[in-house]
């Protein structure tokens, strides 16, 4: 055995390719790529010698395909954007939502969302619709917001005719059977229960702050169906609403990944001259109200000590959201407000961080990093065709609510102060990056095309938006923030509110120079 090992060793050490000794990591061939354990002399900001310079893609937002818009004889707009790939996203967007329910039972849009893609004149059941889409690898979805209802399908582009025909049938010819309405009633009830039980209060707080900001008008109306209205919904109520708001002049058929001429042909075939299930006739009860910002406070006292969904206990928190009126997405100040919102940023105290998480935004640097007891501080910007709302959501222990409110009001006041050039450029870069990254997804492009054409009858291209973002100056941020601070605040509060300051004190803090709440003197603590 020893002789065999010795012979093999001699063979490997002999001549030929097998006998060549391999270079070791200590050899000069490797040593020139290594620092040898010492700190490298080349800084990370300098390119490595001998390495070719990489060519990066430019962030100009230029798209290879043009957004085309055609208006049919009945007023319906057809918008398309071609895109590489064999799949497409097609849908119908409608100027319909909770803001238009002033003359109707609140919650109709919420019910229609649950009834979407149910049985129609051509399809006997939801299963038949799904089987039809399955033949083209398709999926469907319906979403409602305060001002828009969207029916969408993603499928193989070869099935475009089938998809548009299906969408037209779903939107204009739903059966709305008693059984389907009862199923939708159960789904709405479950969603309302879930909304009140979930540990994350953000959807509920958003609902409350809109109610406070726009008292009983337009976008301040309930987005979710109130519990007392769930049992009142029937086919007649739904048809009365559909007759006035599901009209061609309030619709856009949008498609991404399709040829425009083919989409227009399908629209003429299925959406021109058709009689909807609720009959024809002029829309007479259409709400064209303009949003009236009122400001105010909405409070909901609730025991938040046991909201954990599992065995791990969740800390008892009080949540507040303070908002001020900003501007509509049609105004020139919309872009500065978007940059301001990105500059504020924020998040939760347990965020893992990482690239793009906004760890250098103001709400992280000034709030979460300095106050360990703050569980959340996040900025949100809601914008509509006639108004907007910039909010900060914060969460903390109920005993520190007053201090938390003062920290938030101070951050609002600081918005109108000095804006550092570095933080502004970082916010602009992050906003541009987020915009371009989101627009890589076909469904997002579809929604962008549809919403813009629905609101403005045209589409502002990404490179135009990038140019507007780059043009934002520190004085623009200071100007829009100063204008915003002159308005009344909208306040939403949820949880143990025993330490919540009075609304007048919050308003006084936002009107002060330093954002501090008025001092409260108590004889007994």
Swiss-Prot record:
Localization, UniProt: Mitochondrion matrix; Mitochondrion inner membrane
GO molecular function: metal ion binding; metalloendopeptidase activity
Transit peptide, residue positions per record: 1-33
Modified residues (N6-succinyllysine): 64
GO cellular component, one term: mitochondrion
Positions of modified residues (N6-acetyllysine): 299
Main localization of the protein described in the UniProt heading: mitochondrion
UniProt keywords, alphabetically: Acetylation, Membrane, Mitochondrion, Mitochondrion inner membrane, Transit peptide
InterPro entries: Metalloenz_LuxS/M16, MPP/UQCRC_Complex, Pept_M16_N, Pept_M16_Zn_BS, Peptidase_M16_C
GO biological process, one term: protein processing involved in protein targeting to mitochondrion
Pfam families registered for this protein in UniProt: Peptidase_M16, Peptidase_M16_C
Record function comment: Substrate recognition and binding subunit of the essential mitochondrial processing protease (MPP), which cleaves the mitochondrial sequence off newly imported precursors proteins.
Family: Belongs to the peptidase M16 family.
Quaternary structure annotation from Swiss-Prot or TrEMBL: Heterodimer of PMPCA (alpha) and PMPCB (beta) subunits, forming the mitochondrial processing protease (MPP) in which PMPCA is involved in substrate recognition and binding and PMPCB is the catalytic subunit.
Descriptive protein name: Mitochondrial-processing peptidase subunit alpha
Gene name, Swiss-Prot/TrEMBL: PMPCA
């Amino acid at each position: 055995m020893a002789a065999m090992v010795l012979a093999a060793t001699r063979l490997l050490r002999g001549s030929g390719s097998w006998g060549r000794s391999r270079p070791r990591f200590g050899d000069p061939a490797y040593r020139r790529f290594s620092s040898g354990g010492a700190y490298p002399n080349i800084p990370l900001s300098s390119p490595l010698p001998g390495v070719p310079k990489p060519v990066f893609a430019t962030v100009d937002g230029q798209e290879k395909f043009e957004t085309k818009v055609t208006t049919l004889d009945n007023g319906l707009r057809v918008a398309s954007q071609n895109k590489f790939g064999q799949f497409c996203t097609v849908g119908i967007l409608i100027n319909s939502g909770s803001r238009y329910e002033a003359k109707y039972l609140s919650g109709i849009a919420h019910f229609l969302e649950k009834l979407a893609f149910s049985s129609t004149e051509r399809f006997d059941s939801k299963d038949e619709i799904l089987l039809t889409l399955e033949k083209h690898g398709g999926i469907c979805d319906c979403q409602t917001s305060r001002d828009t209802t969207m029916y969408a399908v993603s499928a193989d582009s070869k099935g475009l005719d089938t998809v548009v025909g299906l969408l037209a049938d779903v939107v204009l010819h739903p059966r709305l059977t008693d059984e389907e309405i009862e199923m939708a009633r159960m789904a709405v009830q479950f969603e309302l229960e879930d909304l009140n039980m979930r540990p994350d209060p953000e959807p509920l707080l958003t609902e409350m702050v809109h109610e406070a900001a726009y008292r009983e008008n337009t976008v301040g109306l309930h987005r979710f169906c109130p519990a007392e209205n769930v049992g009142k919904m029937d086919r007649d109520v739904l048809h009365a609403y559909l007759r006035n708001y599901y009209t061609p002049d309030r619709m856009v058929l949008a498609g991404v990944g399709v040829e425009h001429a083919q989409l227009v042909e399908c629209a003429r075939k299925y959406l021109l001259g058709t009689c909807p299930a609720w009959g024809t006739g002029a829309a007479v009860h259409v709400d064209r109200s303009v949003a009236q910002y009122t400001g105010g406070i909405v409070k909901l006292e609730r025991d938040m000590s046991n909201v954990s969904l599992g065995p791990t206990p969740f800390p008892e928190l009080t949540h507040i959201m303070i908002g001020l009126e900003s501007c509509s997405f049609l105004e020139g100040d919309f872009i500065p407000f978007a940059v301001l919102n990105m500059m504020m940023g924020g998040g939760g105290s347990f965020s893992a961080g990482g690239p793009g998480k906004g760890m250098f935004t103001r709400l992280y640097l000034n709030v979460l990093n300095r106050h360990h007891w703050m569980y959340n501080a996040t900025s949100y910007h809601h914008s509509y065709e006639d108004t907007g709302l910039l909010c900060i959501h914060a969460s903390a222990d109920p005993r520190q609510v007053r201090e938390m409110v003062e920290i938030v009001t101070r951050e609002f006041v600081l918005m109108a102060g000095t804006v550092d050039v570095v933080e502004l450029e970082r916010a602009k870069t992050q906003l541009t990056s987020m915009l371009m990254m989101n627009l890589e997804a076909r469904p997002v492009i579809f929604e962008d095309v549809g919403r813009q054409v629905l609101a403005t009858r045209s589409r502002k291209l990404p490179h135009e938006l990038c140019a507007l973002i780059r043009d934002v100056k520190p004085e623009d941020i200071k100007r829009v923030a100063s204008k915003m601070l002159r308005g009344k605040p909208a306040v939403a509060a949820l949880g143990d509110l025993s330490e919540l300051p009075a609304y007048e004190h919050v308003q006084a803090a936002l009107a002060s120079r330093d954002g501090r709440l008025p001092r409260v003197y108590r004889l007994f603590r």
